[in-house]
């Protein structure tokens, strides 16, 4: 009987530790035992083949297992047997989105893993022991938090809640972080999920940096690098310097250098700070005409006047530009660009205008405050895909048909144009329409003419602006040539070419209707910046 009492005490102890539903189950089990044994339960114990109540048996059995299993192994996720359980989970998700309490009393049973149960607490008032008022005045949002979870995910939160200087506040104001960005950070901390959007990624990066969540910050930088283009490169350059992200800064410079005119004409250029403006104007490798640089600086000055609540006058534009004006290499402009543009802008003083005109025309040139040395720009690289070229009496003829080839690179480059063969019958002029597509979408095209001298050399034909090419994706390069003379054509084509640090792969294109393929034909060269 002593043994019976000890076992009963163990069972009662476990009953106190188990949820209410298990208690009910145990009560049913004990009733069945009593009904089967009548009043002689003690005799069965004494026989040596005693049976424990069902709950106790299950507990002891689990304790004797040596191999530990994760919750997901013990309770594998299954599809709901009926629509009611699905409705419960949908309602639960609805409550999460609306920052409400969980209505289900036993919600823990719906989520088999600790990760899923932890995620339930995201943006949930249930058991919240701190609240954040996030956002600037007039645009705040009150968000719940759980100190333990936050401290595990961020050393800043750990110091805030459990450090030596921890403050016991129920509500914390964070005016310098956008609510959407703060929620994105909380979602990562609670759910181990990264949810980024183009319009909030910079704010999320700021939050991740502020609260030292390095993996989220790295994901933000990767997102920005992937979405980097001439339209946003200048803004991202400014932000990358602010966040001290040198890799992102380098990627921004690569885009700005190669697609300088597009970057300078973008709306984002006008949103940069003065320090970034100076950095761009100093840039030796900008691939842009100086008149474009000058016009971009004036556009920036106009927006800066608005930011400073200054009248849009010539004097104020020059005032906000300050010494940055002299970083524009006005003496290196074409004379027509200067005479019809900068000289008539009103930004230059009369003496400056006269001195620059003398710089163009006089043998004894005056001293100028402006930099008079032209920018170096970028040197284009050429990827030649044929090992030899030839001509025959009946090839290569053009009658408005398309020559096309597909290519892919292993790092981001900027296609500036194509190198094309010329006439094999002496000097001749060709009309060329070049085009670059990705999955049927035209990324760049240009119609121009080029003159060939009868040699087997290639002759460059340029796009209006370099086209950004992403790695590991096939693009289609096409050209339609119109000319009366037969031309040279390539032979012994290569499927892969190493050009500096860039590997280029080639494959045939279904757009080609004039015979060009990997082994031979036209488009012998890709001209690009890397």
Swiss-Prot record:
Pfam families associated with the record: BACK (PF07707), BTB (PF00651), PHR (PF08005)
Residue ranges of domain BTB in the record: 128-198
Keyword terms of this UniProt record: Cytoplasm, Neurogenesis, Nucleus
Cytoplasm in keyword set: yes
Domain (BACK) ranges: 243-308
Expression across tissues: In the somatosensory cortex, specifically expressed in spiny stellate neurons during barrel formation. Also expressed in the olfactory bulb, piriform cortex and hippocampus.
GO cellular component: cytosol; nucleus
PROSITE patterns for this protein: BTB (PS50097)
One annotated GO biological process: cerebral cortex development
Feature: compositional bias, Gly residues: 36-46
Coiled coil regions in record: none
Renumbered residue ranges of the record's region Disordered: 23-48
Function noted in UniProt: Acts as a key regulator of dendritic field orientation during development of sensory cortex. Also directs dendrites toward active axon terminals when ectopically expressed.
Record flagged with keyword Cytoplasm: yes
InterPro entries membership: BACK, BTB/POZ_dom, PHR, PHR_sf, SKP1/BTB/POZ_sf
Protein name: BTB/POZ domain-containing protein 3
SUPFAM superfamilies assigned to the protein according to its UniProt record, in alphabetical order: POZ domain (SSF54695)
């Amino acid at each position: 009987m002593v043994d019976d009492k000890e076992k009963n005490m163990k069972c009662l102890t476990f009953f106190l530790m188990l949820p209410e539903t298990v208690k009910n189950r145990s009560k049913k089990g004990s009733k069945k035992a009593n009904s089967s044994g009548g009043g002689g339960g003690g005799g069965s114990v004494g026989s040596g083949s005693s049976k424990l109540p069902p709950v106790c048996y299950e507990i002891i059995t689990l304790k004797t297992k040596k191999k530990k299993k994760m919750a997901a192994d013990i309770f594998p996720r299954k599809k709901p047997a009926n629509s009611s359980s699905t409705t419960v989970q949908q309602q639960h998700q609805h409550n999460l989105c609306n920052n409400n309490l969980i209505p289900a009393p036993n919600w823990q049973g719906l989520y088999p893993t600790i990760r899923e149960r932890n995620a339930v607490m995201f943006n949930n008032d249930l058991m919240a022991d701190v609240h954040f008022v996030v956002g600037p005045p007039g645009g705040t949002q009150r968000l719940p938090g759980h100190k333990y979870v936050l401290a595990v995910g961020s050393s800043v939160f750990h110091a805030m809640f459990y450090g030596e200087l921890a403050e016991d506040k129920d509500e914390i104001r964070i005016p310098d972080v956008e609510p959407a960005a703060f929620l994105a950070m909380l979602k990562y901390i609670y759910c181990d999920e990264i949810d980024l959007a183009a319009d909030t990624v910079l704010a999320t990066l700021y939050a991740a940096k502020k609260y030292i969540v390095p993996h989220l910050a790295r994901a933000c930088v990767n997102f920005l690098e992937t979405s980097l283009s001439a339209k946003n490169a200048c803004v991202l350059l400014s932000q990358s310097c602010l966040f001290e992200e040198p890799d992102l800064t380098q990627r921004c410079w690569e885009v700005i250098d190669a697609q300088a005119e597009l970057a300078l004409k973008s709306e984002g250029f006008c949103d940069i700070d003065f320090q970034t403006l100076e950095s761009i104007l100093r840039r030796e490798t900008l691939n842009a005409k100086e008149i474009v640089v000058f016009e971009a600086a004036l556009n920036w000055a106009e927006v800066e006047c608005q930011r400073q609540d200054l009248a849009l006058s010539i004097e104020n534009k020059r005032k906000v530009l300050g010494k940055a004006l002299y970083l524009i290499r006005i003496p290196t402009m074409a004379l027509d660009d200067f005479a019809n543009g900068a000289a008539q802008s009103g930004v230059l003083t009369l003496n400056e205008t006269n001195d620059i005109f003398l710089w163009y025309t006089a043998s004894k040139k005056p001293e100028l405050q402006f930099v008079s040395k032209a920018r170096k720009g970028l040197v284009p690289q050429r990827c030649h895909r044929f090992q030899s070229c030839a001509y025959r009496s009946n090839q290569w003829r053009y009658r408005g048909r398309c020559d096309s080839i597909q290519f892919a690179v292993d790092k981001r480059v900027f296609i500036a144009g194509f190198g094309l063969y010329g006439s094999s019958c002496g000097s001749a002029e060709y009309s060329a329409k070049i085009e670059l597509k990705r999955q049927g979408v035209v990324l760049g095209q240009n119609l121009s003419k080029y003159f060939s001298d009868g040699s087997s050399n290639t002759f460059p034909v340029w796009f209006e602006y370099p086209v950004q090419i992403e790695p590991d994706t096939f693009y289609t390069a096409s050209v339609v040539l119109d000319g009366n003379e037969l031309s040279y054509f390539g032979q012994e084509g290569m499927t892969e070419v190493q050009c500096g640090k860039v590997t280029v792969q080639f494959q045939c294109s279904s757009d080609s209707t004039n015979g060009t393929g990997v082994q031979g034909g036209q488009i012998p060269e890709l001209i690009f910046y890397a």
